[in-house]
Amino acid sequence: MTKTPTAPPLRGQLRRTDKIMTAAEVDEFLARAFCGRTATVGADGYPYVVPNLFTWLRSTIYLHTVLSEGHFIANVRHSDRVSFQVDEPGEIFAYGHVECDTSVSYRSVIMFGRITILDDEAQKTRFFESFMAKYAPAGSWGRERGSFPRMGSTIVYAIAPEIVTGKQGILPAVSDQWPIRNLTGSPGWKPKGSPSDP
């Protein structure tokens, strides 16, 4: 039986309220997540998504690109409205006797907000200090710290979130996984060819 489509939820509302991450969980996840994806929209109406290394400081996403003309900077100039997404896949597991009774543990954060270009050199320096502390912590390869001679050839962006949602699927205990426990989403299904096969 086909389900009748329902009206889409308002932006920022999650249908699965049982999977909502707390604000503290979202903050911790964004602080350590490795890579995010930024979605912009161009003057031609096409969306454009790029992966970015980033930092999360004082409830703001910071990222950078090289100082050159491309889709990303053109889209930012066209519209400051963006979406930013981070996810972390976990372990695939079975929870029932039907093949499609398969799921995965995960964490995912999506935000909608406004992006700006940072022109202040002190702000850009703080970004690069936090960026290098995250991706190349003190002691990495024994190099000089705090020198950013190519800062002038980069563009630093700040995304101020307006709406942030976090969603997670927690890996169940082994005792709650198939075949120890059958939590199938299709309780009436029987193996094909069995006498009760519909």
Describe the function of each predicted region.
Residues T60, R81, R114, I163-T165:
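Structural motif
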Residues T55, E69-H71, P172-V174:
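Short, surface-exposed beta-strand-loop junctions and turns on beta-sheet-rich folds
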Residues A33-S68, F84, Y95:
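Short beta-strand segments
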Residues S68-F127:
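Short, structured beta-strand-loop surface elements
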Residues M1-R15, T116-P198:
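C-terminal edge-of-domain segments
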Residues D18-K19, D27-E28, I61, I73-A74, ...:
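Anion-coordinating catalytic cores for phosphoryl-, nucleotidyl-, and glycosidic chemistry
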Residues P9-R37:
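Short, basic/aromatic recognition patches
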